[in-house]
């Protein structure tokens, strides 16, 4: 049994610890700033644009010359408001990226003009670093047995973001989850950070004809923030449907323009 003299300092210590823990807890659940949410929106919008550009460019290349891009990397880059998508592969020494085809976006976003690079144009800049980054991410990524898409976007300090996310395989079914965002060094050779955005893959079934969904919903267990691919998930749907994202302390809503609001704070 504790004596009276000993019990008092112990009680004071416990109270101090409780206050410290409460303070630390409060810090960990502070709401994200408008700038943080806007950055997620911006990356999600770019990811959706990249995905659509790669899709339409691939269709255009395969129409022009079927099977010629099998086994090649596709890499998209936005310049002056338009997307260019190149198809090619790394040289054996990984010092150049050989471009075999280039598809340039036209006035309509879904239209691409394809040109074949007969001289096998080689790139030693963005496309080279992006191709390296893709292969580094491919080597690390461990997914389930299903198709995945990959995208490369610019990151701060000339680094690269590489996204690996499940591909849509059935009409009107839009998968979300099981995705990773890598932060790769500027030269494309090293993983700086690996962010598992969602664990499992969710594939909500399409609604019956005549029914309309007010909003989708899924939960996050890995972070207290919505992810870039949550924005992508909303934007890729046709028609677009808002998505509610529940975390341990917040309820977010991703709107059909990609913007994010905090709907509720949980204690």
Regions found by a protein language model. Name each.
Residues 2-14:
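Bacterial N-terminal signal peptides that target proteins for export
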Residues 2, 18, 25-33:
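Non-cleavable N-terminal signal-anchor transmembrane helices
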Residues 191-206:
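A short, well-structured beta->alpha microelement
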Residues 27-116, 122-157, 202-267:
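Active-site-proximal loop/helix of nucleotide/amide-processing enzymes and allied scaffolds
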């Amino acid at each position: 049994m504790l004596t009276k003299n000993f019990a008092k300092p112990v009680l004071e210590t416990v109270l101090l610890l409780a206050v410290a823990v409460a303070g630390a807890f409060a810090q960990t659940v502070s709401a994200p700033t408008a700038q943080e949410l806007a950055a997620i929106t911006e990356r999600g919008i770019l990811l959706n644009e990249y995905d659509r550009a790669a899709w339409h460019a691939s269709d255009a290349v395969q129409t022009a010359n079927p099977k010629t891009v099998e086994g090649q990397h596709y890499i998209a880059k936005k310049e002056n408001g338009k997307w260019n998508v190149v198809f090619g592969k790394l040289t054996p020494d990984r010092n150049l990226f050989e471009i075999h085809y280039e598809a340039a976006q036209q006035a309509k976003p879904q239209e691409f003009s394809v040109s074949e690079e007969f001289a096998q144009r080689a790139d030693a800049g963005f496309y080279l670093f992006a191709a390296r980054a893709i292969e580094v991410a491919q080597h690390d990524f461990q997914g389930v047995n299903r198709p995945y898409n990959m995208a490369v976007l610019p990151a701060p300090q000339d680094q690269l973001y590489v996204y690996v996310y499940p591909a849509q395989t059935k009409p009107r079914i839009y998968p979300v989850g099981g995705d990773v965002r890598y932060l790769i060094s500027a030269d494309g050779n090293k993983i700086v950070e690996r962010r598992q955005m969602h664990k499992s893959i969710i594939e909500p079934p399409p609604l019956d004809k005549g029914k309309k969904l007010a909003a989708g919903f899924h939960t996050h267990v890995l972070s207290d923030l919505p992810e870039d691919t949550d924005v992508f998930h909303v934007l890729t749907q046709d028609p677009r449907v808002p998505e509610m994202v529940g975390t341990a302390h917040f309820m977010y809503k991703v709107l059909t323009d990609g913007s994010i609001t905090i709907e509720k704070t949980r204690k």
